[in-house]
Amino acid sequence: MSGTILENLSGRKLSILVATLLLCQVLCFLLGGLYAPLPAGHVTVLGSLCREDHARQNDTSFLLYSRGAGACIPVTREEVEQDSTKMANELVHVFQMPLPRDLRDLDYSRWQQNLIGVLQVEFGYDSSSELREPPRELQLTIDMRLAYRNKGDPDNGWKLYAHGVEHRYLDCVTSHVGPTETLYSCDMIPLFELGALHHSFYLLNLRFPLDTPSQMNLQFGHMHDLTLTAIHQNGGFTQIWLLLKTMLFPFVVGIMIWFWRRVHLLQRSPALLEYMLIYLGAALTFLNLPLEYLSLVYEMPYMLLLSDIRQGIFYAMLLTFWLVFAGEHMLIQDAPNKSTIRSRYWKHLSAVVVGCISLFVFDICERGVQLRNPFYSIWTTPLGAKVAMTFIVLAGVSAAIYFLFLCYMIWKVFRNIGDKRTSLPSMSQARRLHYEVPLDQKVEDWAGIVYFYTKAFFFQLHKANESKGLIYRFKFLMLATLVCAALTVAGFIMGQMAEGQWDWNDNVAIQPTSAFLTGVYGMWNIYIFALLILYAPSHKQWPTMHHSDETTQSNENIVASAASEEIEFSHLPSDSNPSEISSLTSFTRKVAFD
């Protein structure tokens, strides 16, 4: 009578499998910690001032640059101060990226994937001005022109990438009070976001037009220093990340094919948990697919959006699977009907579906619009910033609540199994030894359980005459599920905060380390890889007879006793109860009678 590999695999083989997977997990952490740089880097660029010809102010193809042949003549701050109108409608703030280093021009690499720009504004008022304190949520109108050129292009070969007149709202504080003017420093504001870093050099021209009839920018005195922070993904991290994806992708595809083939060899339809496992493997395969290689050849500004969609699908599938995984082993219902997502889990999964749809809509509103206008950001208006912050906070709170609910479900599974263990003394020896490893002392606390798991996996389970201890194997797997869920939730919350920190607070420095990111990503693959192996149907018959001169007769009696109990348990799904895929689920559904 066959079951799953989890219950039929020998202790020696199980120990080797667990040790190998743990070694792979350690290697994933070391790969990010020892060889990968930080996931993201940034360059701070101080804007250069250039004076524009009035005749070409409306010519969007006219671009000013500060380095190279044909560069503009820079305007000093003293010249601006001496001008009676502060050169209103004539000044252009120029930012050229990346900056040179050691008298050598640097260029962006396509391995760096994306580019985000945030701006910090500093402006001042004359001390004689009546408007000494700027109002909060001060509206600033900016004429933005983003251009690019590649290696081999002439210094003046800039091509317009995007142009727009956008509004930004500033919150400023007094930074310096002098005898002639008062300076104000403002919070960082999002400026642009490029989903593909396809070109070698980028140029940004900023103009702050003044217009009396429309009251445009009249609340400002005069601009001082403008600082642009250009954030990019580190190319070295991208290479390590794609290397990890490239290595993991074929292994997951291979184990999925192997798992589904073993399921279809059985004379039954796949169970719900088996369907969920193959769906989870498919979502992970979609996430592992190294599509980023295409961005090294083609310009794909939608890659950020596509990456978010792929990760969102995986998160939704993983969260759904954990609820079903715990629920299928609770089995507290008495109805013999076949388990389905709609019949049993619609209440639990409705929150997951609503949360995923909300985040998808939020992402489309942000990065979907940026495909057409890279200067757009939902953070630019006070209302949009509050909505975006609300989404981030709710996402983090929801993730924490989900983890607590999952802990509660797994606790109920453990309690349910503990209640059913009271029936073990009434079972035959073969049936009892299949579920529980004989212990010298009771293991009731968590520390004892963890100690026993280690002992059972690496010392006792390899002995041929020892019991397989299905209950403790399952509990070990559930604890591994909790660890995986905890790290996933922590990574999700840190990712949301790291993504939004440049938009809502420049004083917060949150950046997940490369070791954490590669470790969690490897953990997802290793965890799902292990589930596909352990929950695959086994072709081994149970129980196995051990022949020796002293034990042959007793084993024959045990097997005969176990055979008489086959009517009490069903290791694999049957027509009457198709949701059971292992003897443990049968054990949690009914009490055996010896």
UniProtKB/Swiss-Prot annotation:
Residues 571-594 are annotated as: Disordered. It is found in: Presynaptic cell membrane; Postsynaptic cell membrane; Cell membrane; Endosome membrane. Pfam families: WLS-like_TM (PF06664), WLS_GOLD (PF21883). Its main location: membrane. GO terms for cellular component: cell projection; early endosome; endomembrane system; endoplasmic reticulum membrane; endosome membrane; extracellular exosome; Golgi apparatus; Golgi membrane. The chain crosses the membrane at residues 14-34, 240-260, 271-291, 312-332, 345-365, 391-411, 474-494, 515-535. A segment polarity gene required for wingless (wg)-dependent patterning processes, acting in both wg-sending cells and wg-target cells. In non-neuronal cells wls directs wg secretion. The wls traffic loop encompasses the Golgi, the cell surface, an endocytic compartment and a retrograde route leading back to the Golgi, and involves clathrin-mediated endocytosis and the retromer complex (a conserved protein complex consisting of Vps35 and Vps26). In neuronal cells (the larval motorneuron NMJ), the wg signal moves across the synapse via the release of wls-containing exosome-like vesicles. This is Protein wntless.
